[in-house]
């Protein structure tokens, strides 16, 4: 039963029974399993607090076909990393005909790939940092010549800053490349941008207030994102009205360029000239106590339970093709 994406069918739901039986997918097998467990349990508790018939479902332990045999009517995806937010799961759910939250197959796959996101963003007029693809040692010297030191090496399709390394000396580039390429074959380098980091959460086609992030660590890495208590978040971010509006518009444009939808986040660095540069988009952001989307939602009066409800509403845009109403 093939699903089709119909954004015009997005609707506000007032009765929890309208959602039916909901599976919250979390855990999985990626390097971000630990964070997914935190996110999924928080989402599960919040949905149940609103009267939704929600159940835990870990695809590491259960086949996805159990979604059909257990008669789940829709899925709240709280899986992070490869296999969860890269289009793989979304494609499987499309084949099963089970509506799900957030971006579809293409938007998820592109959003997980930082390189393709950057290329599409540039084509859409969204600024992003220069970059060099690293395939081996022959690329090291040209990368340093073009980007200068320090620079940062990134695996293209890992989330939560997994595998990223700041490189200050040329002799450290081989080990940084080895760390990233041990996770995947697509690796690239960017110049180190010493400015401030901002993020913009997106929900149902609207950009929420930006958040400025300050960490005592070298950069906003896995530990700083989820476990440190000395990372500081500012919402309002301190930007003027014009700069704030510009940043939100860039976030929406980047999300649209990648074909992403429903909810998510766009991350930026502000360079020395005050120009925001897109780092990446995230189509299934964390939903933990340290997470940024819940923080931005609170700034506009949306509590955590309401946020999980609003995200679940995005599943109504995925409908079986044969049941979709005729387009006007």
Name each model-derived stretch:
Residues 36, 129-131, 151-176, 197:
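Glycine-rich phosphate-binding loop of ATP-grasp-fold ATP-dependent ligases
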């Amino acid at each position: 039963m093939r699903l089709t994406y119909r954004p015009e069918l997005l609707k506000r739901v007032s009765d929890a029974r309208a959602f039916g039986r909901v599976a919250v997918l979390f855990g999985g097998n990626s390097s971000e399993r630990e964070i997914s467990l935190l996110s999924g349990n928080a989402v599960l508790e919040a949905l149940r607090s609103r009267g939704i018939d929600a159940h835990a479902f870990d695809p590491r332990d259960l086949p996805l076909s159990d979604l059909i045999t257990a008669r789940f009517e829709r899925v709240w995806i709280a899986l992070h990393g490869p296999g969860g937010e890269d289009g793989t799961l979304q494609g499987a759910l499309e084949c099963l005909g089970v509506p799900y939250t957030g971006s579809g197959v293409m938007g998820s796959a592109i959003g997980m790939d930082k390189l393709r996101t950057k290329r599409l963003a540039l084509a859409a007029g969204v600024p992003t940092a220069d970059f060099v693809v690293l395939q081996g040692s022959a690329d090291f010297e040209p990368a340093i010549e073009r980007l200068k030191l320090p620079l940062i090496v990134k695996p293209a399709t890992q989330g939560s800053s997994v595998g990223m390394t700041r490189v200050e000396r040329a002799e450290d580039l081989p080990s940084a490349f080895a760390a990233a390429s041990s996770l995947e074959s697509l690796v690239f380098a960017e110049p180190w941008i010493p400015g401030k980091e901002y993020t913009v959460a997106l929900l149902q086609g609207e950009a929420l207030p930006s958040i400025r992030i300050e960490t005592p660590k070298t950069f906003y890495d896995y530990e700083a994102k989820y476990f440190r208590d000395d990372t500081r978040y500012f919402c309002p971010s301190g930007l003027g009205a014009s700069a704030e509006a510009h940043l939100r518009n860039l976030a929406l444009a980047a999300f649209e360029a990648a074909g992403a939808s429903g909810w998510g986040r766009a991350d930026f660095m502000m360079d020395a000239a005050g120009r925001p540069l897109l780092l990446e988009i995230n189509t299934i952001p964390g939903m933990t106590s340290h997470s940024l989307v819940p923080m931005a939602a609170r700034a506009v009066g949306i509590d955590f339970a309401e946020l999980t409800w609003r995200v679940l509403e995005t599943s109504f845009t995925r409908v079986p093709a044969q049941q979709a109403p005729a387009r006007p």
